[in-house]
Amino acid sequence: MNQTLDNIVSLAKQCRGHHHYDISIEQIVVSHEAFNQLAAYLRYKQYKKVVVVADNRTFTAAGRSLCDKLKNESVLYTVCLIQSDENEDVIADERAIMQVLLETPNDVDAFIAVGAGTVHDITRFSSYKMKVPFISVPTAPSVDGFTSMGAPLIIRGVKKTIQAQAPIAVFADTDVLCQAPKAMIAAGFGDMVAKYTSLADWQFAHWMANEPYCPLVYQLTIQSLNACVDHMEDIAAGNEKGIHVLMDALLQSGIAMLLMGQSYSASGAEHHLSHYWEMEFLRQNKRQVLHGAKVGVSTPIIVEHYQRVFWPLLSELKQRPKSMDETIWERLKIYTDSIQELLESLPSPERIRAMVEKVGGAVAPQQLGIDPLLVERSLKEAHRLRLNRFTMLYCLNECMLMEG
């Protein structure tokens, strides 16, 4: 990572910007020797019985070799292969969680999540409910949620992020990561590019709604984003240096969330659009699209919407809309210039699309099978998925366009 785990803990103790949550992660390894160090970690923790959670693809990519290592270490293990749905998608929903809980022995010492975001979300929630720790083994640099506490789950068809627990350790084998599908690498880059708008929404929410804000968490996140942009060529090439930079950035972004105890820094309106599209795909029984691919598309859409719709409307307001709270109105007047500077600091939608396209990601909704009408609807409704987040999209829809 850009910062070592110990450095981040030290910086958090020095930071006075916010009350930080304890980082429960004891070890992070991103190297060729990750599985050997995982075995040593299990010996150190004296874990004798574990459940390996994976799906068919991730078990082939890393689970089988990991189980061989466990066998050599005389660690008893149960393999839980998450069943896919009729579209061959693995979904983090009630069915998957119930499968893990039913297949887990009562005397298990720890879970090991072998996979990408979805497998981790399922394992994170299941282990939390069983009051058992889990260890992260990422198989692709595809999301920034590996080290976070939040578990985005589909509950009765609705996307909800439930606070659960972070892994106690992360062991990412660079050989495995470099073999990840190009689409998953592009998705990881897309999840980092999304920080442009998530950080802007967070700053706006702090100004308008006094939501918690921490300069250290902001700095860790922007540092991770900049590292990815600076090494875009290597990430696009899929070489070891690029994959290492991307994985480090994703892990550090997740640790930043962990410090806050919330995902303010990493998830704004661009994520709400992504979740809205995901729910619609589930309703239509369509194959799912990688989370990072969706936010790679939604981020420039949000930038464009903020710069061409939100800002012009805000700058022309002469009196308080009936639907706007008096306090919000007063703060908007105070921070108008700051909001303008914030929006002007964002890369253009064209620049963001060029970056995502450079690493092989989709840049238009149609490339992901997302209908323009769905995009239009999500810009009006997606903020309702997180009504406790005062994003610019929320302000636009709930405070500025709700007259009458």
From Swiss-Prot:
<feature type="binding site">
    <location>
        <position position="144"/>
    </location>
    <ligand>
        <name>substrate</name>
    </ligand>
</feature>
<dbReference type="GO" id="GO:0006650">
    <property type="term" value="P:glycerophospholipid metabolic process"/>
</dbReference>
<keyword id="KW-0594">Phospholipid biosynthesis</keyword>
<keyword id="KW-0963">Cytoplasm</keyword>
<dbReference type="GO" id="GO:0005737">
    <property type="term" value="C:cytoplasm"/>
</dbReference>
<dbReference type="GO" id="GO:0046872">
    <property type="term" value="F:metal ion binding"/>
</dbReference>
<dbReference type="InterPro" id="IPR032837">
    <property type="entry name" value="G1PDH"/>
</dbReference>
<protein>
    <recommendedName>
        <fullName>Glycerol-1-phosphate dehydrogenase [NAD(P)+]</fullName>
        <ecNumber>1.1.1.261</ecNumber>
    </recommendedName>
</protein>
<feature type="binding site">
    <location>
        <position position="148"/>
    </location>
    <ligand>
        <name>NAD(+)</name>
    </ligand>
</feature>
<keyword id="KW-0521">NADP</keyword>
<feature type="binding site">
    <location>
        <position position="291"/>
    </location>
    <ligand>
        <name>Ni(2+)</name>
    </ligand>
</feature>
<feature type="binding site">
    <location>
        <position position="191"/>
    </location>
    <ligand>
        <name>Ni(2+)</name>
    </ligand>
</feature>
<dbReference type="GO" id="GO:0106358">
    <property type="term" value="F:glycerol-1-phosphate dehydrogenase (NADP+) activity"/>
</dbReference>
<keyword id="KW-0479">Metal-binding</keyword>
<dbReference type="GO" id="GO:0106357">
    <property type="term" value="F:glycerol-1-phosphate dehydrogenase (NAD+) activity"/>
</dbReference>
<comment type="subunit">
    <text>Homodimer.</text>
</comment>
<comment type="similarity">
    <text>Belongs to the glycerol-1-phosphate dehydrogenase family.</text>
</comment>
<keyword id="KW-0520">NAD</keyword>
<feature type="binding site">
    <location>
        <position position="275"/>
    </location>
    <ligand>
        <name>substrate</name>
    </ligand>
</feature>
<feature type="binding site">
    <location>
        <position position="55"/>
    </location>
    <ligand>
        <name>NAD(+)</name>
    </ligand>
</feature>
<feature type="binding site">
    <location>
        <begin position="117"/>
        <end position="121"/>
    </location>
    <ligand>
        <name>NAD(+)</name>
    </ligand>
</feature>
<keyword id="KW-0443">Lipid metabolism</keyword>
<keyword id="KW-0560">Oxidoreductase</keyword>
<keyword id="KW-1208">Phospholipid metabolism</keyword>
<keyword id="KW-0533">Nickel</keyword>
<dbReference type="GO" id="GO:0008654">
    <property type="term" value="P:phospholipid biosynthetic process"/>
</dbReference>
<feature type="binding site">
    <location>
        <position position="191"/>
    </location>
    <ligand>
        <name>substrate</name>
    </ligand>
</feature>
<feature type="binding site">
    <location>
        <position position="271"/>
    </location>
    <ligand>
        <name>Ni(2+)</name>
    </ligand>
</feature>
<keyword id="KW-0444">Lipid biosynthesis</keyword>
<dbReference type="InterPro" id="IPR023003">
    <property type="entry name" value="G1P_dehydrogenase_bac"/>
</dbReference>
<dbReference type="InterPro" id="IPR016205">
    <property type="entry name" value="Glycerol_DH"/>
</dbReference>
<dbReference type="Pfam" id="PF13685">
    <property type="entry name" value="Fe-ADH_2"/>
</dbReference>
<comment type="function">
    <text>Catalyzes the NAD(P)H-dependent reduction of dihydroxyacetonephosphate (DHAP or glycerone phosphate) to glycerol 1-phosphate (G1P). The G1P thus generated is probably used for the synthesis of phosphoglycerolipids in Gram-positive bacterial species.</text>
</comment>
<feature type="binding site">
    <location>
        <begin position="139"/>
        <end position="142"/>
    </location>
    <ligand>
        <name>NAD(+)</name>
    </ligand>
</feature>
